[in-house]
């Protein structure tokens, strides 16, 4: 079991985070990283959706 520390309000206010883009990519002030276990599944889902819709799935409706 992992030991965790409860942060105070002041400590929480000092915490800075990054941005998660929902596709396995997350970025912070130090750069970006890819969680390939998530990205590969998302790439597969997007490819299947585009294949079955003739390329008109999701973000690519135009």
From Swiss-Prot:
Entry annotated with the keyword Secreted: yes
Disulfide bond residue pairs: 27-32
Localization, UniProt: Secreted
Leader sequence segment: none
Keywords, comma-separated and alphabetical: Antibiotic, Antimicrobial, Bacteriocin, Disulfide bond, Secreted
GO biological process: defense response to bacterium; killing of cells of another organism
Name of a matching Pfam family: Bacteriocin_II
Chief subcellular location: secreted
GO cellular component entries: extracellular region
Proregion span(s): 1-18
Matching Gene3D superfamilies: 1.20.5.130
Family affiliation: Belongs to the bacteriocin class IIA/YGNGV family.
Function summary: Inhibits the growth of several Gram-positive bacteria, especially the food-borne pathogen L.monocytogenes, but has no effect on the growth of a number of yeasts and Gram-negative bacteria.
Protein name: Bacteriocin piscicolin-126
Lineage, uppermost ranks: Bacteria, Bacillati, Bacillota, Bacilli, Lactobacillales
């Amino acid at each position: 079991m992992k030991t965790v520390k409860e942060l105070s309000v002041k400590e929480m206010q000092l915490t800075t985070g990054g941005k998660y883009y929902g596709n396995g990519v997350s970025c912070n002030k130090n750069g970006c990283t890819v969680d390939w276990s998530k990205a590969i599944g998302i790439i597969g889902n997007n490819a299947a959706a585009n294949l079955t819709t003739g390329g008109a799935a999701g973000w690519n409706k135009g």
